[in-house]
Amino acid sequence: MSQHGGMTIHHCTIDPCTIDHFTIDHDGVTIAVSRGGRGRPLVLCPGLNSTQADLHELAGLLRRDHDVVTFDLRGHGLSSAAGDYSFQSFLGDLGAVLATVLSSPGGSGAAPLLVGYSLGADLAVHLAAAHPGGIAGLVLIDGANPVPEPFLTPDVLPELRAMWTDLAARQQARQGTPRQVLLSGDEIAGLNAEIDVVRAAILDRYRAIDVPISMIMSTAMAGDGDGIAQRFNRNWRAGIERLVRQRPHITTSWLAADHGLVFTHAPEIAQLVRSAPGRAGRTAS
């Protein structure tokens, strides 16, 4: 165990690399972070209701040729609970992790590739737009989608609220584990409503980004069911089509999967990340 700038770092060896586990105190919350691997730096941001433990397969594959930083958002995994689960609070978590990584002792000084899944993709876009020069490129996995229609419409809101309440109840069984999620059903619903608003204006954020962007999207985000699922899937594809019309330099890959693609298609995603363009040699500014 060692101390660096207020961070407590615990070392453990996991083949084929050493993983450093440390915490960052930010905004009254303790953020759990892990770092290991070799190659160009990469920060992997999980999504709502997912943890770095859930993303272990993808992170392990990426560590073969990247120096990978993973972490748990507030109220998730090994990070502490919080009184605020707004989009801005989660954005602050990602910003704190990135700032710590860039200033850490022994770092290369190179700007990292920023990879975000679901909510993590939206956070990555907002961070990149607000801090030009801080990253080498973006890989966005099934998120940050400028969908033409909101998902939380009055006709489906009761069903979605019931689904999130049930999800929060089931997640109670994971409390005390690296896969715990502490948000209530109402907090999950509130954040999803905020994400609808965020995505309605996210095209403006894309216009402010000057690094390469790659999208990895699911063909059936909401699954293969009828009715609402098909409507959501059409809206999802329409959002990406809208994005590439306005930002044709963005590369897009589609995987035959639902929104759980990071868990079911980790090898394919890792390969796409490896081939993602980035500003080689770019240093953080």
Model region roles, listed by residue range:
Residues 2-30:
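N-terminal cap/lid segment of alpha/beta-hydrolase-fold proteins
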Residues 34, 60, 70-115, 157:
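Active-site loop/oxyanion-hole signature of alpha/beta-hydrolase fold enzymes
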Residues 72-76, 144, 257-258:
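Short beta-to-alpha linker loops that shape the active-site pocket of alpha/beta-hydrolase fold enzymes
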Residues 116-120, 124:
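Gly/Ala-rich beta-loop-alpha elbow adjacent to hydrolase catalytic centers
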Residues 129, 138-171:
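Flexible "cap/lid" loop of the alpha/beta hydrolase fold
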Residues 176-256, 262:
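Conserved serine/cysteine hydrolase catalytic core
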Residues 247-285:
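Catalytic active-site module of serine/aspartate enzymes centered on a nucleophile-bearing elbow/loop
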